[in-house]
Amino acid sequence: MQISPETQLFIREHQTDDVRALALQARKYPNVDMPTAITQIAGRQVAAEKIPSWSDMDDIWYPKHLSLEQCSSEVTARYKATLLKGNSLTDLTGGFGIDCAFLAAKFKSAIYVERQQELCEIAAHNFPILNLNHINVKNEDGVSYLQAMSPVDCIFLDPARRNEHGGKTVAISDCEPDVAELEELLLNKAGQVMVKLSPMLDLSLALKELQHVQKVHIISANNECKELLLILGQASVEEISIHCVNLPTKGIQEEQHFVFTREQEQCSECNYTNALENYLYEPNASLLKAGAFRSIASAFPVKKLHPNSHLYTSDVLVESFPGRAFHIISQCSLNKKELKESLGDLKKANITVRKFPATVAELRKRIKLSEGGDTYLFASTLNNGQKVLIRCEKA
């Protein structure tokens, strides 16, 4: 791919413009390769949010929209780079190259493997601009390359998670390449293997399908679950540690990190309550994905509302709780009189349902509240079966 000076100038001058409007003005700019310009402008706009350290570099090339939307964000790529170390790295599913770029910065040599020629051309162009001259780009199929490659310290791969009809998958065996089928070969080629998976995949099923998982990292960014990472190694471990991470992206919160094992979850003591106290807690998205419900109640001085509610309460604020904390203002049932007394002054609220016999939409219709504002309303069930609406504000 080549970009002419005229097109490069157009990209710089219009990098914040609406690409749909630009597409309609193509005839006004006969010397500009408009399809390429639109792809690059759209890429820069996504990068401004997703890869901020790259977005100000004029010479970075971006792929078509679909590939960019599927790639990692900078914050998750940086986190992954803290988990691997060694001299040599091979990325078998290169893609746009964000993960490879941040991982390779920690290695003396790296190989990027990608079967799409256009993505390889983009990666080969971008890596030197990022001062990553030690990455060797290979335009090959990842599985074929794996079979013939020499051993390295670490392998990274991000299997495709779409089925033949474009639907989302829940099992590793439905992904391409099939890591379960390749597990022994992968570990013959590297002492450590990192597999990046969609958070939509079933973690319990993944741990049954793979025999050599040592650690699991569930990564959220601003409380949105983004990635499921499995670290495979040749040495066996008695218990698989599960790391639940919530990363800040706006610089306004601290990283939250909680580690547990499935064995600890089964054995942890959990106190339940029939009465709300002063504060309410909602675990972050990584904890909810991991199922660390009893472990959280055991690790922090909080009580669980109900075995299936996944909400917690305490008398004194627990500032270190890995999730969102709220100050409880009031509580009520769905009784009309109680609703009026507790919520009568509200016009809008953020509503969450946890173990409650109504959807958010049904509740909004019944209590006539629009979305938004500073008030949070949790509809849940206490341990004695009592249904409650809990009015809160952020602690």
Q: Across the structure, where does each feature detected by a protein language model lie?
A:
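SAM-dependent transferase fold signal centered on methyltransferase-like domains
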Residues: 1-395
